[in-house]
Amino acid sequence: QHHEEDMDLMLEMGVNAMRLAHYQQDEYMYQLTDQSGILVWAEIPFVGPGGYADKGFIDLPALKENGRQQLVELIRQNFNHPSIVCWGLFNELKEEGDNPIPYIRELNQLAHQEDTTRPTTSASNQGGSLNFLTDLIAWNRYDGWYGSTPKTLADFLDSTHRKHPELRLGISEYGAGASIYHQQDTLKQPAPAGYWHPENWQTYYHIENWKIIHERPFVWGSFVWNMFDFGAAHRREGDRPGINDKGLVTFDRKVRKDAFYFYQANWNTTQPVLHLAGAQNRNSDY
């Protein structure tokens, strides 16, 4: 029932692809994507340190064998799902510490041994040799949220494409936090780690970032982070602890944020969309 509710909301918004991060998903979700014609990036849980004080990869035989097993199981269990278009090998790894590059090469070869028909991909958040190992590469970018402005996304994409035109590059994550209870009349960039996560900044962020992505046909795909607010135990930001509020829909699936309707207007070609942004701002003078 929960998977069906999530799928209905995504179809309502008009998505045509999803990244099922960062781990194997329930079989029923793959059945729903098959039925709905949504393209899927499926991946194993080989994840860098993120917000935790760790290095992500530890060069131990047990860890590497576990990764091999999970990749083989992911591919063999889901090989016949037509919605799956690529296999993801890692998310936000670092070359510092134990260098994961030889192991990623091994996983890439293993994926092609198991499936000769689908490309491999990965989600990076830095430069270096990590970005030249899989068939496709995508970056997690938060230009205009974790500092900088949306314009830096344009600079990054253009510069990377100019230097490495051979790279098949995409955007694996982009997003900004928002609380439906935080409303402001002015457009002011908030502090990501702070309490105040105004909804209108998230809307602005997505309008500007999507414009940049849409204008660059060399970007093979892009994935909003995230469709729904979700639990994240280490986070102490926004209006609730333990929640990542970058979703376009609230955690309980009850409220579609303004940015949801922006994408619906751009992506859903089957129905017209009229939505008044900022309607939840009860303190406005207009």
Label the model's feature ranges:
Residues 1-286:
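Extended substrate-binding grooves/exosites of carbohydrate-active enzymes
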